[in-house]
């Protein structure tokens, strides 16, 4: 049998969900944004105008999740879709000023939650956490590429 409490994928999934729920309370309750909508807004704020396919990669959401989030955000006047000047078959999405303003309101609140979580660690532990996440992430990507 498997010991889930010692199984790395399970432990990471539980941690990821807990951290995500802590953060999503901020934008969900106060700003009525879903997790997917927030991820799209944050990706656009970070990387700028992008194709929906790039948003899917940037947010780790699937195309349908991105499509639903983009539709709602567009309806709320936070983003806009437009024709890709380089390829008229594609559409690009970009933040509108109200979307940028919303991100500016949400980010400090999210950062405060993350700071609270990380305050449990001393500086050396934080540095180690960053290094471990990077190393395990690189190895996971290596296995994904290998198939």
Task: Please tell me what each predicted stretch does.
Residues 9-10, 33-42:
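Short alpha-helical elements of helix-turn-helix
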Residues 1-31:
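N-terminal leader segment of winged-helix/HTH proteins
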């Amino acid at each position: 049998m498997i010991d889930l409490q010692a199984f790395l994928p399970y432990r990471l999934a539980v941690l990821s969900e807990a951290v995500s729920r802590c953060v999503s309370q901020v934008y969900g309750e106060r700003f009525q944004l879903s997790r997917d909508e927030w991820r799209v807004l944050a990706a656009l704020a970070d990387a700028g105008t992008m194709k929906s396919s790039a948003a899917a990669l940037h947010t780790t959401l699937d195309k349908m999740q991105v499509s639903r989030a983009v539709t709602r955000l567009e309806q709320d006047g936070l983003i806009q879709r437009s024709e890709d000047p380089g390829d008229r078959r594609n559409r690009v999405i970009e933040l509108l000023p109200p979307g940028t303003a919303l991100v500016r309101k949400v980010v400090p609140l999210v950062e405060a939650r993350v700071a609270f979580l990380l305050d449990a660690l001393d500086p050396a532990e934080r540095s180690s956490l960053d290094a471990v996440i990077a190393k395990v992430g690189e190895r996971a990507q290596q296995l994904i590429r290998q198939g």
